[in-house]
Amino acid sequence: MSIDSRQVAAGMLDAVPFARTLGFEFVEVAPEAEGGVRAVVRLPDSPATHNHVGGPHAGAMFTLGETASGAVVLAAFGQVLDRAVPLAVRAEIAYRKLAMGPVLATARLGRPAAEVLAELEAGQRPEFPVPVRIATEEGKVTSEMTVVWTLRPN
């Protein structure tokens, strides 16, 4: 699988203006073993996104993780967007440690893309998880989340 990370980043920033508003930076969108996809998105340190203790606001971190998961979905399933709409179905986040400074969300496809596509081809509405880890630039995990996505046939 070949992924044009610049095209994925541009597509996400075009489709989700809120990601531009928060200043997200797309660090990497890359294939992984067995048809997997990984996306890394960065939230710079900015007073505009701080909470009451001076770190990134929980809502900004949630949006960062959801955006990274969306980049995974776009990279993995962009070829079927003419016949299916990707939608987040549900998400859960656990805030583990206080985050300070810039944070990075690393999202990975939680199910083989081929399985998801086979369900879509069979006329189903597949669901699949995208686990996300949010960490400081030093690698300290501050949050973990899972976003469950679907591909809704047109």
Language-model segments: what does each one mean?
Residues 99-100, 110-154:
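HotDog/MaoC-like acyl-thioester-processing domains
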Residues 20-22, 37-39, 87-91, 101-103, ...:
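A generic structural signal for short beta-strands and their flanking turns/coil linkers
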Residues 20-26, 89-95, 115-117:
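Short structured motifs
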Residues 72-111:
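Hydrophobic beta-strand-centered segment that forms part of the acyl-chain substrate-binding groove
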Residues 44-71, 81-82:
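Hot-dog-fold acyl-thioester-processing enzymes
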Residues 25, 92-94, 106-108, 133, ...:
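Residues located in well-ordered beta-strands
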